[in-house]
Amino acid sequence: MDNKKIRMAITHGDTNGIGYELIFKTFAEPEMLELCTPIVYGSPKVAAYYRKAMNLPAQFSIIQKAEDAEEGRINLLAAVEEEVKVDMGVPTEESGQAAVKALDRAMTDFRDDLYDVLVTAPINSQNAFIEGFAFKGHKHYIETCLGEGKKGLSILVGDTLRIASVTEKLPLKEVAAQITVEKIVEKATLFQQTIKRDFNISNPRIAVLALNPKNNEETSCGNEEKEIIIPAIDELAGKGVQAFGPYPADDFFGNGDFREFDGVLAMYHDQATAPFKSINDGRGVIYTAGMPVIRTSADITPGYEIAGTNTADESAFRNAVYLAIDTFRYRSSYDEACENPLPKLFHEKRDDSEKVRFAIPKKKADSPEAKR
């Protein structure tokens, strides 16, 4: 790896939200510019408007193409050339279009290898459209532009928890039908590979959550654990993936068991997001796994209710910047090691100690817990 600073593309998000406030506050600290070269894909006029309206201490240089970005400063790339009306705190079609145009330009520039990592400010999917089609979120858009048919995985990343979900946003009544052995194996395998490559953990342990509140034979509320989830865990073990479970979510998080694992695979969206938000208190990051581009985002909304008030907390956005830098370094080192492997001097001996350690404890039939 060379000593050149990481080139970080940053999309401005919904122009009526808190995107520019987060960006300018994050890079107000000079040491942030020592870590990377930020290239903000946005509108120079909108950026200047927010800087003046909130008296933000931000200096930026306007550029027309990413190749012109220089180290030691905020580079504002004019991805949105037309006039954009700013109406702080109000989601409009115009503000949504500006968000998508910045992201689209960033996708084009990544194909041309003009930056290393991508950090996105929040977008509102309800007012973002692409030539008449609804915007389904950053992950879906990146899959469409760069995935070449592959599907990504959204991982919520905090200080003590990484969690992903087998299914995406669905009505709860449809979740069970969408959970299959194949899907669990696919998501868990990608999760494990991502933790190894992008988070520098050589042999990650994955906890798999149960779908139903109770999952032992006597008190189970459903058959999905026995018929789908446990067979999937067994198949993962055969592939060399350290997957354990299934664990009922209430006890798993209530007892702090998540701290024993490198990743947690939930069955549905809210089973992942509810404990994550409670544990991370607004400082969490969304990581898009399985795509060529390293993309992170603060796990927050566009913040219309506080837009323009200069009260937005940039902690999660700064964490997204840090995570993008860390994962780029880890991925680069991992890929370099894979391209130039050292000869193996010994072979690892596997045993069942880990499997025993993380096994679900059997409850006695007459115990109070078994009767609940």
Feature-to-residue mapping (PLM):
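Active-site glycine-rich loop that binds ribose-phosphate moieties when present
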Residues: 140-144, 148-150, 172-196
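Intrinsically disordered or low-complexity boundary/linker segments at protein termini
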Residues: 171-176, 302-306
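Contiguous, glycine/small-aliphatic-enriched amphipathic segments in soluble metabolic enzymes
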Residues: 1-138, 185-267, 271-278, 282-284, ...
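Short, flexible loop segments at boundaries between secondary-structure elements
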Residues: 145-161, 289-305
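Short acidic/polar capping segments at secondary-structure boundaries
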Residues: 123-126, 160-161, 169-172
